């Protein structure tokens, strides 16, 4: 990556990385000790896939990263969870680090990301908001300094408790998934009554209270975030004894959507897919 090789595809990312490496603002290293000891803030940005068998988020990589960071802390450091994690993970990360390094001077903050694949650079430069969950003014000041370049865009910076920040991410994704699921069910109704779902969505979206984003009927939501995040939120709610019937319905409706769409495709092709390219 230091020489310009980017392991993922994101439009414009290679140029941004190359320019900042050349300017000396960005560097890459595999030396954990050197990186952590020089840092005022260390971000944990690792995968949190759905755990096989029970639907909960797998936090193995998060806790391993916390242990690796703990081994190399030197001076006051803010450890920031950037990964999408269930409520209470920040407290667990703090416990992991404290157990490994009782003498360490650190805070744990939650700073969820809201980037969209394909427009991540623009979303980072002009975010709707920056959410930071932490409990100390010292940590808040470090996070303010990190995001100060965005202040010229008047980006709202919301400071909350850790648990609130963690839940904001899950609740946001669940709400967007709900909009997608809602318009899909309206699309099914449109087919029955002879209405055009595109016109219905357009008429709904012009209401500023609703907005037009995520009102596009289709095969349901997918990708790397919405399915695992809605399921993780549902599992967290169930574990806490909280009722989230809307989220449960969204997950169930979306799961049923894909086979239903497959049946519609088959019907449109005369009921037989053998030998056909879809």
Stretches with model-predicted labels:
Residues 1-278:
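Structural/interface elements that position substrates and couple domains in central-metabolism enzymes
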